[in-house]
């Protein structure tokens, strides 16, 4: 139960910190943190939680990561369902808190997106469904490659949180214009439910693509690195 609670809290922090920075701070007049600031915020949530709860749950914070680690032989199948439930509930709870905070500001309109992920007319840069699919698969594949490598027993000790957090920052820098960056089905779900409509209709992609990418990343890592000692 402790690990499930840790995943709930960790995913809550990721959504509140990452999506919160996008909704509340990215475009703040004169002092907005902008595109790069949002990317950094997502990375910082992972770094901070990895040090805080990594020793409790492994700090997955992401159904695709849990599934990828299972595919890579690093996580038991029996733990997948409760981990994913905890992650999704944490993301939804964070979305609710963020909605309450954001709705207290002048001019807030959840229909503007609320940091939701999307493609076609709902892509920040107008990217197609195919472009969004490829982007999310490839970004999540490399995210799992970094996670698998950084947490390998053969890797330098103590640096995994930094490597993983920086990888997530880089992923956001690349893909925010394409999909608003998911690579995390829980993160996508936690805000899409409050937007409704198109955000929920397009949510399927942000479950399917990250999971495919995560499994590919784990399998590729096993192929090139072999078994950990």
From Swiss-Prot:
Residues of the site described as Involved in tetramerization or stability of the tetramer: 19
One GO MF term: water channel activity
Q: Which InterPro entries match?
A: Aquaporin-like (IPR023271), Aquaporin_transptr (IPR034294), Aquaporin_Z (IPR023743), MIP (IPR000425), MIP_CS (IPR022357)
The record lists the catalysed reaction(s) as: H2O(in) = H2O(out)
Motif segment (NPA 1): 62-64
Alphabetical GO CC annotations of the entry are:
plasma membrane
UniProt keywords (A-Z) are: Cell inner membrane, Cell membrane, Membrane, Repeat, Transmembrane, Transmembrane helix, Transport
Site (Selectivity filter): which residue positions? 42, 172, 181, 187
Q: What does this protein do?
A: Channel that permits osmotically driven movement of water in both directions. It is involved in the osmoregulation and in the maintenance of cell turgor during volume expansion in rapidly growing cells. It mediates rapid entry or exit of water in response to abrupt changes in osmolarity.
Q: What is this protein called?
A: Aquaporin Z
Please give the organism. Chromobacterium violaceum (strain ATCC 12472 / DSM 30191 / JCM 1249 / CCUG 213 / NBRC 12614 / NCIMB 9131 / NCTC 9757 / MK)
